[in-house]
């Protein structure tokens, strides 16, 4: 069997296993298989997740992908991920530059990547957390990942800011340092989709998937239940209140846990449930914001206002 066929088989088996385990976030690492990084993998993984997991009420919110970049000398030549529609997948291109990860890289000449640490951060984070949160997600223990590199072996410190900006704009996840801070952090929590999408960050996908799971589990017991109508054929206030309360219960807990800012459940009383047998419930979510940049204007004045 050809190596690419083996990889495809492993991927299919992986996702069948993930479906069974109901994993919420996972990683796909192909670096040690000498499998070169390709954006086609991102699309294929996303299709598998959306088709076989999300569509069957088993949503996987985040798949981190890393593959071999040892032969890619200039990472800015990688495809801009804004051109993809793989909202459930993120591309990790970071790597350790001086610790154990570095020695594994030197010994194998294949990308080791920082996928494991990134997956750990996503798993530790609340669904609304961005893993770029400096105060919460230090990726280094003082030794490993203390010297950030890229998965082709290049040190982050050796690259111009314009190079880093290009990779950031292309929506890749990599390691970085801050002046005056000893930790190592990631640049952002991007997914492989255009930046204007509602699902362009890992935390957005995790938040809405948790809301979907919560509403599904709380409303499911009412499937097949009676829908009481007024004399004019509209839904009664009691019926609307009942289904609204079902949809709200887990969303209310998410607000308490600071995973949502607010939400609204809307049920039209005029929908024709007698003809369709279908009750439509609209749920609007107001997410938690993320301080992706902080601008401080500071200067001298002649007097304080």
Question: Can you annotate each of these PLM segments?
Answer:
Residues 15-19, 158-164, 170-173, 249-255:
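Intrinsically disordered, low-complexity boundary segments flanking structured domains
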Residues 237-261:
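Short, hydrophobic/π-rich interface segment
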Residues 120-239, 282-305:
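Long, contiguous, structured domain-core segments that constitute the functional module of a protein
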Residues 1-143:
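Extracellular Cys-Trp
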Residues 10, 41, 73, 203, ...:
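Catalytic cores of large soluble enzymes that bind and process phosphate-bearing ligands
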Residues 23-25, 168, 258-260, 274-276:
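A generic structural signal for short, non-catalytic loop/turn and secondary-structure boundary residues
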Residues 4-6, 260, 265-305:
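Compositionally biased, low-complexity/repeat regions
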